[in-house]
Amino acid sequence: MRDTENKAKENSVRGLELTAEKINSYSAAEGAKALADLKKQSIHAMEENEAFLMKLLQDNKDTEIGRKYDFASIKTIEEYQKRLPVTIYDDYAGYVIRDIHNNEDNLMTAYPIKVYCETSGSLGNPKIVPMTVNSIHVQQKYNSLISDAIKDMALKPGWKKGRVMTLLESKMTEMKKGKEYGCLSAIFMQEAKAVLPLISTTPAEAIFPDGNTDTRYLQARFGLAASDLVQISTTFLSFAAEILRYIEKHWQMLVSDIETGTINSKIRMSEDVREKIQGKITPMPERAAELRAVFEKGFDTPFATKVWPDLQLISGVGTGAFEIYEYKIRERYVDERVQFYFSGLSSTEGLFSVPLAMGDKKSAIVPHSMFYEFLPVDAQDDFSQIVTLDKVEVGRDYEIIMTNANGLYRYRMRDCIRIMDKYNELPLIQFQYRLNQVADIIDDHTEESAFTKTAMDTALQLGLDLVDYSVYPDRDAPLPRYVYFMEFAHMPEGITREQIRTVVHKNLEKYSPDIKEYIKKGIGAPTELHILQPETYMLYHDLMVFKGRNPAQVKPVHIIINEFHYRFFSKLIEEEWEK
């Protein structure tokens, strides 16, 4: 994105007229170079990754951590592994506090720190991780640019001329002494700000909201008004499913506002923002008529490609817990003309992998992004079983232990990934689940994927329009059991809660067979079900944002592991279904 913005400034100086096509063409060309570079690294991936580690240690030998472990004398991977312990965030919290509050530097990393990023924890104060210019460059080269190269190979040529509905919200806060705090996506949005009006339908007031703005309305309204939309881009596919559902529910208001060039008076935003938005819109009766003609026919068939004939792509995280949203989007909102780009494994802590092809849920690790170690998930924290990338086994599940330019050394990510295949020497991985997102009522170790498959199968079998679900492992009941909370947008007439509950329970027994055995032995109880009020999950998202979380970092709660979440969903049960 930074390269794109710099190109924009250069062209502005030269008096050239920038267009979406020129910007996307430039990004795709640069991305093709980055993709070729990654494929070259794949031939000798282990050597490339070892060289990355040795350079990192030499560059950081004079940091406080580097002196503590004598980075200067480490010459082999084996020495590095013997000298440095496997770490968690608590090992770095003190350094981060000293850096931010005391303005000390050269503690964790010698590289310039651009910003402090928040992680996506569910509650409380998110963990803060420094983001160096080196790591940002890696994200831009291998994540942002490669995605454009893959689009260019897979999509019809017209994609470069169209715009994208951007479902990202940038939030950056200034801390002490000019230091900035936010999330990774905010960095990219800030650096691309100069060209956003050319490539995105979403107005700046929704991408950089003031905290009191109904961004869903702005994303949907401006997106619907644009007939040249070719992409929907989001962090997680849950946001894409949510905005399409919002359009389905509120299309009459949205179309009316587009027709008259107004903003509905009930939409939440400050007068200053309302005035700015009003200055960007004009009545569009012809576009409104096109939209109304589509929506008045109902939603029995997907509407997205009818209102946006040029729509070719939806991109975002769609593996693991987010597969449920891909299914929902494909089932209800788009047809086979729309492709999906599944983002690789990336987080505040670093870039782990990128896909090599459109629609591929496997993604290749990036040897120049971090040094990779892999702990088998079934090793039960026996660190002697840690292996490097050249020793991983296809089909096996691992936790990544990473070392990167942000000052994290042998850091546990607590993510379960599976080695799906290899591209030359590059492992191709796929995210499975968070290691702390496994539930037990006795000793079943039911993974989030089992709960997700249960919910998806139930919706498919009964014709339910599932919005989302959460599961609570109720170990305090007389007999331990799982309690499902489910929100539905549409349900078949005459269906009962007990009918749904019965199917949920049968499906959960299929994906977690221990539950059936517990009931047979008389030590476990059948699954319980509560149906939630409409827009419960939308309310949860808004509440987390109100509590200070960055919108781009709010993830769905599929396994309830704390009292706050349990009380929140319990308070929003639809009482009429409990009778």
Regions found by a protein language model. Give the residues of each.
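Active-site glycine/GP-rich loop and adjacent strand/helix microenvironment
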Residues: 2-72, 80-84, 95, 102, ...
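Contiguous, well-ordered alpha-helical segments that form the cores/surfaces of helical PPI scaffolds
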Residues: 114-118, 349-352
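Conserved nucleotide-state-sensing and coupling region of NTP-binding domains
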Residues: 159-175
